[in-house]
Amino acid sequence: KILAEICSEINDSIESIEHIYYSVENNTLGEAALVVINEYGEENFKGIFLSEPKKQGTSRVYRKGFNTTNRSKLTVCATFKNLVETKKLKLASKPLVSQLKNFIASGGSYAAKLGEKDDLVMSLLLTVRMAVLIREFDASLDDRMPQDDQELILPMPFLMS
């Protein structure tokens, strides 16, 4: 119900459901959210629910939302780094910047340091993945988002002041 209220509040502010996008990471917590969305009725949410496109040639069961793997996390981290370094994304949230300072390479992927949180970082990375997906259908985002076929520099640490 909270997600429906958030979507409704956004709709009241912009008066157009065509520009409201939402999704969940389809991990354990996201699966619970998907059950609630299904029971509440997706049609009762103002906006468009985004899901990762089904990959051809896989036998896995398709699930709504975005599946986060080490590879997808590395890719979105590279995209995020590019957006920050090219000043296409400005971070204004002090708690987010604080979490980014504790978001480190860990076992072939990225995660928060032991004892730290990364929920804001992972929410932002999900938002970046959603923006990349939306760009495929909205040409006006082409100049604001890096293209998939552009050479992406692998994620490296960067300092923010």
State the predicted function of each range.
Residues 127-161:
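Acidic two-metal-ion nuclease catalytic site recognized across multiple nuclease folds
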Residues 28-29, 96, 115, 128-131:
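Short, glycine-/Ser/Thr-/acidic-enriched flexible segments
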Residues 112-115, 137:
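Long, compositionally biased intrinsically disordered regions
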Residues 19, 113, 120:
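Acidic, Mg2+-coordinating catalytic modules of nucleic-acid enzymes
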Residues 107-110, 120-130:
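Amphipathic alpha-helical interaction/assembly segments
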Residues 117-120, 139:
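Helicase-core coupling region on the C-terminal RecA-like lobe
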Residues 23, 116-117:
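Intrinsically disordered, low-complexity regulatory regions of eukaryotic regulatory proteins
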Residues 1-109, 158-161:
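Mg2+-dependent endonuclease catalytic cores in nucleic-acid-processing enzymes, primarily RNase H-like
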